């Protein structure tokens, strides 16, 4: 079996993010030290990198499932989890990455192009790792001082991609089977393709590096084409993708064939017809030269055979009338190879300069579109004259007449994945975030009522719940007592006199309040003394005062006071 594979489907998955920690600091003499849970580590990503040492996609055929490392969970004592290791996957230069489309369990076909890894070191992140969950120390603020929950890590991105290798060569050799393409590449370079005297010996493309003086260029041997290849005959047009990047197309024509109804001119036109059919279905990148407009040369092979030599001399003027350069060669005797080599080198040099100028012009004319800045302001509804919401709410109806509301958006779906639904406080925090984002207001605007079913997310990550808009974002009543806002520990409240540590300003204010209260009491007592309600023996005299409660009138024998 050949070790050359130029198309594979790969299932990639980024690493999951680690969960945050909901740790509480415990230290001697500090019973209320607060939260200290660290954040979870981010998951690793799957990255394809163009590597000149890679020559085939064979490894991905036998190992199509690739998963990056996951992040670890956060720990107490403010320790964050470690990041998952990125998975670096080398691919040959010239590999194109496509999004795989198709039904589950069936063969996938290429969709949108994700990357074109043409040059050494080109990188493409195809599966992003999940973000690590925040620990409770990161969730704490002045109103939520001791969160009893942490956020879960996000799942890594998971998808199918198709890798398609398109050989990067300067010259592509096309021709009928047994025209001598493999023999030509073996004679001009150090490549050692399989050579035999039967059709379709070459089943995979072969690349060879040719040296001409101080310059070098590459040639690609494309498996043989026959009329009807666009309809699937022979090897079809499967391998013609390898000529998409070549700037020069060289027709190798067998002048010694004994097959009926074949001659050099008919072979040339038959191959051009197949190339045209392939070019009609091809979507080239911006600025690329269409295949019918690329320069062509004609190589008349096997002139070491006398009859072939005569035929080559006969048809040469016909090709020159079409504006084509014609070379008569023999791969067996190496006749004409030197002239062909230097002619191809000069043509390659000319095309490289043209390509460089074209790429520079495209770079100067490129339009850069920058995304709108969304930082700082809360998005408004489109009908309010602002930007669109960061989510959408749609009213859906099932076949049985039941109605539910579907919430879609990056933030709501991400928040749902981060929530631990076994923790009531975490669920409440999610409700606060959704309300602050405007989901509840949008649900009301769409006609939702308490108890209606609401769905957030899609697929296996979807969450269903009955909408209850009565929970306030500031505080809620649990067990009949006001426990304050979610994540608030009343032991840490500033108004708690048992543990509150007063500042110097508070001490001075309390001292002045105490002194003012004492002065007010003294003034009230002095007013009562002056009114005669009481007397101070050390200050007041012993004179009889009828109005005094402490008068010194003489008492009678029967105990009555003498007037």
From Swiss-Prot:
Residue span(s) of domain OCT: 383-469
Gene3D superfamilies xref list: GTP-binding protein OBG, C-terminal domain, GTP1/OBG domain, P-loop containing nucleotide triphosphate hydrolases
Top-level taxon in the UniProt lineage: Bacteria
Enzyme Commission identifier(s): 3.6.5.-
Organism whose genome encodes this protein: Bifidobacterium longum (strain NCC 2705)
Keywords: Cytoplasm, GTP-binding, Hydrolase, Magnesium, Metal-binding, Nucleotide-binding
Biological process per Gene Ontology, one example term: ribosome biogenesis
GO molecular function: GTP binding; GTPase activity; magnesium ion binding
Binding site for Mg(2+): 182, 202
Alphabetized CDD domains for the sequence: Obg
UniProt-annotated location(s): Cytoplasm
Protein name stated in the entry: GTPase Obg
Domain OBG-type G: 169-349
GO CC terms of this entry: cytoplasm
Binding site for GTP: 175-182, 200-204, 221-224, 301-304, 330-332
Domain Obg: 2-168
InterPro entries with a match to the protein in the record: G_OBG, GTP-bd, GTP-bd_Obg/CgtA, GTP-bd_prot_GTP1/OBG_C_sf, GTP1-OBG_CS, GTP1_OBG_dom, GTP1_OBG_dom_sf, OBG_GTPase
Residue ranges, annotated region (Disordered): 529-563
Subunit structure, interactors included: Monomer.
Main subcellular location: cytoplasm
Cofactor dependence: Mg(2+)
Family: Belongs to the TRAFAC class OBG-HflX-like GTPase superfamily. OBG GTPase family.
Its biological purpose: An essential GTPase which binds GTP, GDP and possibly (p)ppGpp with moderate affinity, with high nucleotide exchange rates and a fairly low GTP hydrolysis rate. Plays a role in control of the cell cycle, stress response, ribosome biogenesis and in those bacteria that undergo differentiation, in morphogenesis control.
A Pfam family it matches: DUF1967
